[in-house]
Amino acid sequence: MNDPRSKMMISPGLLPTESLLDSLILISNEVSSMQKFPLVQIKNVSSMIRRIKLLSSLFEEIQESDSPLPPSSILCFIEIFSVITRVKVLIQECTDGSSLWSLIQLDFISNQFFVLVKEMGRALDILPLNLLNVAQDIKEQVDLLHKQSKRVELELFIDPREVQRRENLFEVMSKNCLQNKKTNNNKGFIDFVKVEEIMCSIGLRTLSDYVEEISKLEVEAQNQAGTGGLIVVSNINNLMSLVSYTKSMVFRNDGESEECKPISMFLYNKSKIHDNDSSSSSSFSQSMMTVNIPDEFRCPISLDLMRDPVIVSSGHTYDRISIAEWINSGHHTCPKSGQRLIHTALIPNYALKSLVHQWCYENNVKMNEAITKNNNSSSKRHKNENAIDHISENKASKDAVKMTAEFLVGKLATGSTDIQRQSAYEIRLLAKTGMDNRRIIAEVGAIPFLVTLLVSKDSRIQEHVVTALFNLSIYDNNKILIMAAGAIDNIVEVLEFGKTMEARENAAAAIYSLSMIDDCKVQIGASSRAIPALVGLLKEGTIIGKRDAATALFNLAVYNPNKLSIVKSGAVTLLVELLMDDKAGITDDSLAVLAVLLGCSEGLEEIKNSKSLVPLLIDLLRFGSVKGKENSITLLLGLCKEEGELVAMRLLANPRSIPSLQSLAADGSLRARRKADALLRLLNRCCSQPHHSL
C-alpha cells in the first residue's frame, strides 16, 4: 500500500470550487456508493461509511431548506469536507493495496481511521445544530453521531478477528521455509488447510487473486523502496515469497486437461500426492503435521515432540538432544526459568516418556522414526533429509521472529502512544519464550527504545516495557546490552515511582535478573537509589513483589560492598518482621538475605540486636523448608560464633532447640547436617563449663 499520508494532506482551509454543500453531498455520495470494500479493516470502513451517510442526510436537508449557514457551521463543514476526502483516499488505498500488507499494518491503518473519527468529532464540536433549519430527527441523529465520535476518541478500535488473522499469518510464516526452498517434493511443514483459510479470510480464493496479490506486493515494495527502508522492503519480499510458495501448493495442475484445484480438494487424497514408494520419513512428517502435539509434550527449546525427555537441576524438562546442545554451547542457566544450573546431569523423565509413548501410539505417530539407527543407505538419506528440513524449519521460524521484531521495533520508535502500547505488549509476549526470540529482539535494536519508554507517562506502556526488558534479560548476553543502554536508572525510577504495582514488581524482577552477572551487581549497587527502592518494595509490595525484591537483594548482597548499603536501608529489621508474618509468604527468601548479611559486621550487629529472631529460627528448624532449615542453622551458628555463651544460653534454655538440632544433624541436607553438628559441638562446650548457669 502506498503511504496514505502523502495523499491525505488536504488543507481544511481550502474551499472547493463548487458550493460547499454541493461538494459535501458529492464527496459523501462517492464514499457511500463505493462498491468494492477491502477485506481488511472492514469494520472501520463500514463504521466510517455509516457516519458519512448520516451526515449526507444533514447536508441534503440544509440544501433543501435554502437557509443561510451560520459562520461556525461553515467552518465545521470545511473541516468535515477535509475528513471525508481523506476517508475516501484511505478506503481506496486499503481496497487497491495488498491485503496481506494491510493485515501486517493493522495497527497503523486502524490508527488512521481512529484519527479521522476524532477529527470528525472535533469538527462537530463547533456545529450549531440549534441554528440549523433541519428536521428534529436529523438533529438527533447528528447529535448521537457527535456523542459516538467523542466516545470513540477514548479507545482505538482494532478488530480482534483481524488481530487473530495476523497472528495466524505470523504462525504460518514461522513454519514456512521461505529462504531455503528446494526443488524436491518435501516443501516444509505447512498445514495448507490453515493457510488456505487465512488467505480466504483476506479475499484470496482463486488463482487470479493470488497473482493479483503478488502484483500488489511488488508495487508496494517499489513504493516503499525509497521511504520504507530495507527492513520494510525485506518484510514485503518475505510476504511475496509466502504467497508465491502457497500459490504453488494450494493450486496444483494434476494434468494438462484439468483445471487448477484448491488443496482442500486433494489434501486428504494421498494417492494423488504421493507415489507408491513414499518413504517412511515422509509419512512421519505428514502425521506430525496433521496431529496437534500437546504443549506439555513439546520441548521448550525446539518446540518439537520430546522423544527423550530429561530433567535438569532447575526441575524443568527438555528433550535430551536440545538441552545437551544448549549446555554444550556454553550456557549454564535453565532456558525456561533463567536459573543457574547447579549441575549438568540430565535425569530421564520416565513418567513423561511413558505418556509420550502412549500419545504417539494413540495418534499413530512413530515415536522412534527419527532416532532409530539404520545402516541401509536409503534410511540414512531420508534421515539426512529430515535433519535438513528440521534445520530449515528452525531457520524459517527465526526469520519470521526477526521480521516480526523489526516491524514492532519500527512501530515502537515512530508510532503513536497507542501503537507504542500495542508494540511494547507484543514484544513483551515475543520475549517471554525462547532464547532465540530474546536474542533476535535484541539484535534488531529493541533495547534502547524500550529503555527510553520506561519513563513513559502511559501506565500500560511502562508496564509492558519493563516486563519486556525483564524477559529479554533472561538471555545472558542481553544483560550486558541492557546495562550498556543505561537502563538501570530508568528501571529504578519505575521501581520507586511506577504507575502500577505490577510495573514496580517487574522492575524488581529485572534487577534480580540483571544482578546475576557480577559486573551488573557492581553497577546496580553503585546506584544510590536501587537498594533503598528494593527495600521499599519489600515493605509495600504484594507477595510476588516482596519475593522479587528479596531475591534481588540476595543477588546484590553477594557482592560485599553492597551489604552495607542493604543494612543501612533498614532491610534487616524488615526481613525479621517478614519472618514473623505468615501471610508474607517469603520466609525462605528473607532467611537467605539475612544469612548473607551475616558476612558484614554491620549486618551481624543488626541481626544480633533482634531479640525475637532466635526463637523464630528454632521454630523454623522444626517446620521450615529444606532451604529454610539450612539458612536458619547458618544464622544460629553465626550468632553463636559471634556472641558465644549469650546465644548458646538462649538456645539451651529453649526445650525445642536441642531435639530440632539433633533431628537436623541426622536427617537434614548435607549442608544442614554439617552446620547442625558444628552448633551442637558449640553447645556441648558451653554445657561442659559448670560455672555458668542458665
From Swiss-Prot:
Residues 292-366 form the U-box domain. SUPFAM superfamilies: ARM repeat, RING/U-box. Disruption phenotype: Increased nodulation in plants infected by S.meliloti expressing modified inefficient Nod factors (e.g. nodF nodL) or in the mutant lyk3-4 infected by wild-type S.meliloti. Pfam families: Arm, PUB10_N, U-box. It catalyses: S-ubiquitinyl-[E2 ubiquitin-conjugating enzyme]-L-cysteine + [acceptor protein]-L-lysine = [E2 ubiquitin-conjugating enzyme]-L-cysteine + N(6)-ubiquitinyl-[acceptor protein]-L-lysine. Present ubiquitously at very low levels during nonsymbiotic growth. Accumulates in roots and nodules during symbiotic growth with rhizobia and mycorrhiza. Gene3D superfamilies: Leucine-rich Repeat Variant (1.25.10.10), Zinc/RING finger domain, C3HC4 (zinc finger) (3.30.40.10). It comes from the Eukaryota. PANTHER family: U BOX DOMAIN-CONTAINING, U-BOX DOMAIN-CONTAINING PROTEIN 1. Exhibits U-box-dependent E3 ubiquitin ligase activity in vitro. Negatively modulates successive stages of infection and development of rhizobial (e.g. Sinorhizobium meliloti) and arbuscular mycorrhizal fungi (AM, e.g. Rhizophagus irregularis) symbioses, in an ubiquitin ligase activity-dependent manner. Negative regulator of the LYK3 signaling pathway leading to nitrogen-fixing symbiosis (e.g. infection and nodulation) by rhizobia. May be involved in the discrimination of rhizobium strains producing variant Nod factors. This is U-box domain-containing protein 1. The lineage of its organism: Eukaryota, Viridiplantae, Streptophyta, Embryophyta, Tracheophyta.
